[in-house]
Amino acid sequence: MVVLLCNDRIRLTVLPAFLCTMKKNDIFEDTKKKSDASVYRKKSKTLLIALIVLACAVVFFLAFLFAYRKIKNYLYTSSSVFSLTEKWKAYDYEAVYEISSHMLERKPFSNTALTYHGYSSFYLAVSQTDTSLSQGYLDEAVNCMRLALFSAKKSLVPQLQYMLGKAYFYKNTVTSFYYADLALKYLSLAKDNGYKANDIPEYMGLSYAALGKPMESISSFTEALLLRESDSLLISIAEQYYKVGQTSAAKQYLYRIKKESSDELLVLRAMGLLGAIYTDEKNFSDAKAEFEEILRKNKNSADAYYGLGVLYEKQGDMVKARSEWRKALKLQVNHSGSLSKLSEYAK
């Protein structure tokens, strides 16, 4: 009995302790589970927030990309002034020409479109090697710029007049009609209205020369020399001095070209004019030397053969004179000087 009682007591003592230990373990496990659940919820919440932020970022990026493309397409559309000015800054005259054409289809009297179309047409014209294409572009340039003048801002008018004057100047060089008077009109207006461009006096000088006004031409060329000197300008002045009989002044410019110019074509042109001056002065030996030197450098110079013909004519040797003029016509069938001389002596 004692043993049993002792065992029972031991069992009774051990049981509560065991139950207490179990309870503590359960509480610990519950706490751990709750802690794990809390951590899981926090992680889930963080992940959810991250996903939401990422989704918002993706949506924002796509919206930005869409808006950017829309804006870019708008800015660079064929009828956009922004695109027009950007192409102009890049000297892309063909693109400016096309864009302004599209703009004029929608708004035929848009001053901006007319101005840019006129300007781009002009620059395309002067870059052409085909005369017929050049004429077409110049016609467009003139028409657009004249229309633009009617509605242009006051500050833009002198520039339009300057460009219009240049367009008429080039029309005068590529067509059989005379436009030098209109070139002078608009270049003079641009100058009087305060537009500054170093080439205005030279263009005016060439226009006066085309109209047969050598003194006015010399005046403009002299003004041009003060702004910028060039070999082409020097020979243009020399030619005008020759036309008014001031051969001494002409020779000074021609000597400079022969001595200093690196442009072989201008040097040959200067030698030809010197040969003509020497012929007029009856300095036949120097004249012949100039013409023969030209032919050594360019055996196909019709002008040199013509000059030799005139030299022989003045010496009274008409057989040689006719021979030289015929040589000139073989090289250039429409050489006006040779045709005139042979026609004169055929009578």
Can you say where each PLM-predicted feature lies in the sequence?
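N-terminal leader/linker segments that initiate helical-solenoid repeat arrays
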Residues: 20-148, 152-159
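Helix-start (N-cap) detector for alpha-helical repeat units in TPR-like alpha-solenoids
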Residues: 76-77, 111-112, 155-158, 197-199, ...
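Alpha-helical adaptor scaffolds
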Residues: 166, 236-248, 252-296
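Residue-level recognition of tetratricopeptide repeat
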Residues: 85, 119, 123-126, 166, ...
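Register position in tetratricopeptide repeats
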Residues: 123, 170, 210, 243-244, ...
